[in-house]
Design a protein with these regions (language model features):
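N-terminal signal-anchor transmembrane alpha helix
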Residues: 8-29
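Interfacial loop at the N-terminal end of multi-pass membrane proteins
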Residues: 27-53
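Hydrophobic alpha-helical membrane segments
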Residues: 86-95, 108-126
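Core segments of transmembrane alpha-helices
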Residues: 56-71, 88-91, 116
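Membrane-interfacial loop-to-transmembrane alpha-helix junctions, especially the N-terminal start
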Residues: 11-15, 76-84, 136-137
């Protein structure tokens, strides 16, 4: 008897690793030193509040979980993991770049480098080989736009 094929072009586990990594990243942002909110206030966004941080993530994380769950369960929804992977990959790059630019650890950098970059790159690479160019490009653009929208929400005063 053979095992059933993966439900997604990415397999079942890989898409679901993205929202799991997101939770680990949130834990790092909240629990590291004074936390990401304080880091942002001191360097980039003086009006950034814990309430805004929580509100943003209470919207974004369930959305990421839903998209990645659909991608894990149905091959025709593989493209739904692409925006999540793209946004997390960019977030990992930005945490690393911010730490270097400001000469100070940005809470979230460790999980950004250790989880977001390899997971994001793996999902994007596999999706680029599984999907037609148009759905892949749309997913990539959607992820970049979503990350930009989150950044704008964080910087809004």
């Amino acid at each position: 008897m053979t095992a059933p094929p993966p439900a997604s072009g990415l397999g079942r586990g890989l898409p679901l690793a993205l929202p799991a990594a997101y939770l680990a990243h949130l834990a790092e942002e909240i629990l590291s030193g004074p936390g990401f909110v304080a880091w942002m206030n001191a360097r980039l966004a003086p009006g950034f509040t814990l309430e805004r941080f929580v509100a943003i993530n209470l919207v974004v994380w369930p959305l990421a979980l839903g998209l990645c769950t659909a991608a894990a369960l149905r091959p025709r929804f593989t493209a739904l993991a692409v925006p999540v992977a793209a946004a997390l990959f960019v977030n990992g790059l930005l945490h690393a770049a911010a730490s270097l630019a400001f000469g100070a650890y940005s809470p979230g950098t460790a999980t950004g480098i250790l989880l977001y970059l390899p997971l994001g790159a793996t999902v994007l690479h596999r999706a680029s080989r599984t999907l037609a160019p148009r759905p892949f490009a749309l997913g990539l653009a959607s992820g970049l736009a979503a990350h930009a929208a989150v950044a704008l929400a964080a910087f809004a005063s």
